[in-house]
Amino acid sequence: MGARKKEQAAVGRVGGEYRASRNGSSSRVRLEENRTSEDQAILERRAELLSKSGINSEYLSAASLLSKEPALEVGGECGAAFLPDDCQLDAFRTVAFIEKGNKCFASKGRYAEYFNNPAISLIRSEDGVVEGIQTVENVLYCKQALVVAAGAWTGSLMQSLSIKPDAVPCVPVKPRKGHLLVLENFNRIHLNHGLMEVGYLGHKAAKSPSDVDDDLLSISMTATMDMVGNLVLGSSRQFVGFNREVDESIIRCILDRAGEFFPAIRALSRNINQIRIGHRPYMPDGKPVIAPVPGLPKVLLAAGHEGSGLCMALGTAEMVGDMILNNPGKVNRTPFLMQGRFV
């Protein structure tokens, strides 16, 4: 998600430092909380499935949950799925770390950055094979492949790059706007783990914008402490195109929802230090596209990861690299192909 300049400036100060926390006193393991018997059944089943898959997971009773997170208001039917091996990434530091690694290849002619230089069209050979891309200022040739990984803009970019838009397969990735609230140096509560309500999982898989009102809003509680002690609250999801305006009513909804879980937040003023706005690349079936583009030799897509792009970035890059080099895949690629998924 995008951030205000104050947060962006912090990236420069940390340079390429990468941080992920887990376990011990600074752990940010995940708790998925339920408040109804229906949610309890969902999380108990989820914890069981994760355990069977080899992921450390257990279901916590209300008493066990309260012992781990005293700041929570825990009712009789409350409980949580506890994932003690989960990690929390600092998005800004992680991106800076990856970027620093990429720049090491610049001196070898294997990496370059082009900002404010939009792509205009694909460059094709006489037999239709894509050979490169034309930007406003440059012609960039590709030897083995061209990978389009433009997040929520991927679908519209693919259409704009083709001389005959109807010849390009439709990529139904949609922007799904979200707000995150950052409360700097917030000391009224202390969190020992990253927290989310079980409804967050359902909201993430909400219906396509073609099936619902464009401005349908879903709010589910998420709460984490970042590396410098700020409380980060979320989260909202809505289909409103690429609108980037801060919506004060959504801020109120996020705070009100968080207040249902944390009494200390209920009396909080609306003066939030930072508000992050961004667009998740939503796919109707909940899976990203990581695949060659039918009818466009040498072109691959990597898009539609919704809110999991950062966590899945390195795995996606490995999959794409294996496709380009014709290496055997380490995972089943079929669910991520384009064929048969979109009408």
Where are these regions (language model features)?
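Active-site substrate-recognition segment that forms the wall
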Residues: Y18-S27, A145, A152-G295
